[in-house]
């Protein structure tokens, strides 16, 4: 599988100490969309501060399944999950 077809689960720290979870093929691009107000409705009212973590998947289906599981976690559990992820380049 080429890197171009990879999907990523990503978590954003947002204002109000909240965490947004989503999937994309390009975390840096998607983070920029959230910052510009063109991302999800959630991040229009709770501005993103930084990318907490990201995890690569080979297929969109795998990423969607992981997104559903992560969205069920509490904020504390999501932060613990991110703390265990391998270090990645920050989204710009």
Curated annotation (Swiss-Prot):
Say which domain of life the source belongs to: Bacteria
Q: What SUPFAM superfamilies has UniProt attached to this entry? A: GIY-YIG endonuclease
Gene3D superfamilies in the record, alphabetically?
GIY-YIG endonuclease (3.40.1440.10)
Q: Do you know which InterPro entries this protein is assigned to?
A: GIY-YIG_endonuc, GIY-YIG_endonuc_sf, UPF0213_domain
Query: Residue limits of the GIY-YIG domain?
Result: 5-80
> Short name of one Pfam family for this protein?
GIY-YIG
PROSITE patterns named in the record: GIY_YIG (PS50164)
Family per similarity comment: Belongs to the UPF0213 family.
Query: What is the protein's name according to its record?
Result: UPF0213 protein H16_B0156
User: Which source organism?
Assistant: Cupriavidus necator (strain ATCC 17699 / DSM 428 / KCTC 22496 / NCIMB 10442 / H16 / Stanier 337) (Ralstonia eutropha)
């Amino acid at each position: 599988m080429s890197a171009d077809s990879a999907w990523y689960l990503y978590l954003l720290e947002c204002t109000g100490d909240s965490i947004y979870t989503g999937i994309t093929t390009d975390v840096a691009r998607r983070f920029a969309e959230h910052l510009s107000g063109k991302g999800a409705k959630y991040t229009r009212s709770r501005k993103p501060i930084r990318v907490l973590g990201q995890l690569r998947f080979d297929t969109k289906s795998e990423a969607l399944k992981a997104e559903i599981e992560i969205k069920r976690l509490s904020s504390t559990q999501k932060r613990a999950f991110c703390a265990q992820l391998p270090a990645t380049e920050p989204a710009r």
